[in-house]
Amino acid sequence: MDRRKFLRNGSLTGIGLTAIGSWPRAYGAPGSNSTKKTTALNLEEITIQALQSKMQSGEESSVSITKAYLERIKEIDKAGPMLNSIIELNPESISIAEGLDLERRNGKVRGPLHGIPILVKDNINTGDQMLTTAGSLALVGNRAKEDAFVMKRLRDAGVVLLGKTNLSEWANFRSSHSCSGWSSRGGQTKSPYILDRNPSGSSAGSGSAGAANLSAICVGTETDGSVVSPASVNALVGIKPTVGLWSRTGIIPISATQDTAGPMTRSVQDAAILLGAGTGVDESDPVTNESIGKSTKDYTVYLKKDGLKGKRIGIEKSHLTGNPDLVSLLRAAMTVMETQGATIVEVDVLTPLKLLGTPNIRFCYMNLKTG
């Protein structure tokens, strides 16, 4: 299904789902008729820069933008196609936006993320009214005493925290046969492109919400593929930062050597903006000391239109066989990269891995029609 057509058709028939946690003040319950649409703001594919321009001109405010995203969440996450990507909404989101609008009126703009709504994965501590559960019923009632270090950095940058996204429970570290995007607390998250398929995990909620334009930007976490896989499946830009570039303090852990949070956005520029905002040395996470002198607060300076020129890009050979439509799309993308100056190299990675005796990777595809 064409992404833009799907997003425009957010009124597909579905059964209403009550949000977990409190709905932000001034809003009726999901599915109710008590709230009129607050703005005609078109959120489809909108970027951080475009939102900032609207706030700077006075055409929009952080409050109006936040309300527009909340309306969209009501329409297609909690009703309509019911993506079920958001496990909990932040009841303080509008008041946070109000405070940031006041700062702007008083001449203070913290940076490119000032007043920008964000969703973060439910294994990242937020020291507020929301829970941090990794999607598990075992942790229902758990409220963190303070923000995770990276969440503090993002708040300092001026984001409006809309809520938490669903995930594969315990970030998929619970079973060798678990289904991506399912948690006992949040249920099953759907792919916004194919509603009877999961959006890949474990940052499934951030992937689905980002693709459906339910927030300007999202944060996921990765041990092994949990940012880049849902980003790839949902046509997003996902970055797994070098471990230590973003602090891991306050994030429910799996691996001391592989874990990190990372950006999930719809454009490379937005990913670069979010990446810089999350960096910082954290005395509680010694590995962040390795980023001293190597990190920056602005990665957008490295974005170049001719950035692919002279680069060699490997393409796994097995992806060039099978479904003809997918192969056609991949080859078209390869052609675009070649016209931008890249050299495409077909490589065989999977065969040597099989020879090493790696276990078969199992993919769980949810089929809502058959249960």
Protein language model annotation of sequence segments:
Residues 1-14:
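N-terminal secretory signal peptides and thylakoid transit peptides that target proteins
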Residues 16-19, 33-224, 242, 335, ...:
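Gly/Ser-rich catalytic/binding loops embedded in alpha/beta enzyme cores
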Residues 20-25:
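C-terminal segment of classical bacterial N-terminal signal peptides
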Residues 28-29, 34, 240-333, 351-354:
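A short helix-breaking turn/cap at a secondary-structure junction
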Residues 66-67, 98, 298, 322-350, ...:
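Acyltransferase
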Residues 114-134, 297-316, 365-371:
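Short helix-loop capping/hinge segments that flank enzyme active sites or metal/cofactor-binding pockets
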Residues 133, 176, 180-183, 356-371:
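Charged, often glycine-rich, active-site loop that binds/positions anionic groups
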Residues 228-233:
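Structural signature of FAD isoalloxazine-binding scaffolds in flavoprotein oxidoreductases
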